[in-house]
Curated annotation (Swiss-Prot):
Signal peptide: none annotated. This is Probable WRKY transcription factor 24. Transcription factor. Interacts specifically with the W box (5'-(T)TGAC[CT]-3'), a frequently occurring elicitor-responsive cis-acting element. It comes from Arabidopsis thaliana (Mouse-ear cress). PROSITE patterns: WRKY. Residues 92-157 bind DNA. Belongs to the WRKY group II-c family. It is found in: Nucleus. GO terms for cellular component: nucleus. Keywords: DNA-binding, Nucleus, Transcription, Transcription regulation. GO terms for molecular function: DNA-binding transcription factor activity; sequence-specific DNA binding.
Length: 179
């Protein structure tokens, strides 16, 4: 499959950088061919917000057949390890939705053809490299697009806060059963 066959709406630079969520957020997500979707995200009834979209996975680029030195090969291997990206469309009045993790805002920029800026966040857990981008759609400002890049390597902090009292109770009760 040629790079240009992946999606005609993306420029070659966007495809090479796996930047499917550049300034074309609304257009690209709405016009991507079905082959780039790897599955459905089912909303949970226990969730406080319901995603209205899908899991997007950009296919890896084909290897190039040029002669590269050792450092070039290492860089190419590092670039070929793609971090998973997941995008959710959510109808909400709030810009930042509570997903159970703690985030630190590290940037914001205005985007062409959109009155709403894009905000950039990092997970605050010390060993976690997950990032997220939050932006409203230009065509429908009631929809927030949240794009996650990476996978958390720790439990959800809010879930643990909720479960800690229950776990303490279980430990307390199990200490009686051991007597």
């Amino acid at each position: 499959m040629d790079r240009e066959d992946i999606n005609p709406m993306l420029s070659r630079l966007d495809v090479e950088n796996n930047n499917t969520f550049s300034s074309f957020v609304d257009k690209t997500l709405m016009m991507m061919p079905p082959s780039t979707f790897s599955g459905e995200v089912e909303p949970s009834s226990s969730s406080s917000w319901y995603p209205e979209s899908f899991h997007v996975h950009a296919p890896p680029l084909p290897p190039e057949n040029d002669q590269i030195g050792e450092k070039g090969k290492e860089l190419k291997e590092k670039r070929s390890r793609k971090v998973p990206r997941i995008a959710f469309h959510t109808r909400s009045d709030d810009d930042v939705l509570d997903d159970g993790y703690r985030w630190r805002k590290y940037g914001q920029k205005s985007v062409k053809h959109n009155a709403h800026p894009r905000s950039y966040y990092r997970c605050t857990y010390h060993t976690c490299n997950v990032k997220k981008q939050v932006q409203r759609l230009a065509k429908d400002p009631n929809v927030v697009v949240t794009t996650y890049e990476g996978v958390h390597n720790h439990p959800c902090e809010k879930l643990m806060e909720t479960l800690n009292p229950l776990l303490r109770q279980l430990q307390f009760l199990s200490s009686f059963s051991n007597l």
